[in-house]
Amino acid sequence: ITVDNGIASVDGVAAANAAGMRVWVTDHHLPGNELPAAECIINPNQPGCTFPSKNLAGVGVMFYLTLALRAELRKRGAFDGRSEPNLGSLLDLVALGTVADVVKLDDNNRRLVAQGLERIRAGKTWPGVAALLRIAGRDPRRASTYDLGFVLGPRLNAAGRIDDMSRGINCLLSDDPGAAARM
């Protein structure tokens, strides 16, 4: 499953298919003349897609995919007697990815960002986001789109350029505030 790429990877998907892999492409970039032969393509900008929000970032595409998967699992009874995953807990990450990807803030993206900032300001953010804000000397209770786009985004991008991008990912997804701060 790709995230935020793959719509132009005709040869890469063909190679993965030849190796016996099943490929799903999730992307928001504009497709070329030829689409990859993936088992599934989720992209609001592909021909024939009726999803109304065409300006999603890759993180937004993946967020809506997880919402759809949860709805399908609910319909199939997968949560009978069990609690459903709280996908709202991901909105701080969705907001960060949306702003850092510099996509157009249409009504849908504005809602995603506003809800994510609301969670951050309420102290309901992932430990990695809180750690990055703290290290940058920013007050989470006053978090803004500036913080997401010009304070956190560049720090995460720098991790990939200087060292290994997985450090930034691990920081964001860490459940341990101390470990997140050390990353």
Predicted regions and their residues:
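Short alpha-helices
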Residues: P36-F79, L87-V94
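Alpha-helix capping and helix-loop boundary segments enriched in small/acidic/polar residues
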Residues: V3-I7, L30, C49-A57, G81-S83, ...
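N-terminal small/polar loop signature for handling phosphorylated ligands or for N-terminal nucleophile
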Residues: I1-P36, I41-P44
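Hydrophobic helix-and-loop "lid/oligomerization" segment in the mid-to-C-terminal part
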Residues: T2, A19, A71-M183
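Short acidic, glycine/serine/threonine-rich loops at helix termini
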Residues: D11-A15, E34-E39, S53-N55, R74, ...
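Alpha-helical scaffold elements adjacent to nucleotide-binding pockets in ATP/GTP-utilizing enzyme cores
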Residues: G12-A15, V61-A68, L112-Q115
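Fold-independent oxyanion-binding glycine-rich loops
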Residues: V3-N5, T26-H29, P44-Q46, L65, ...
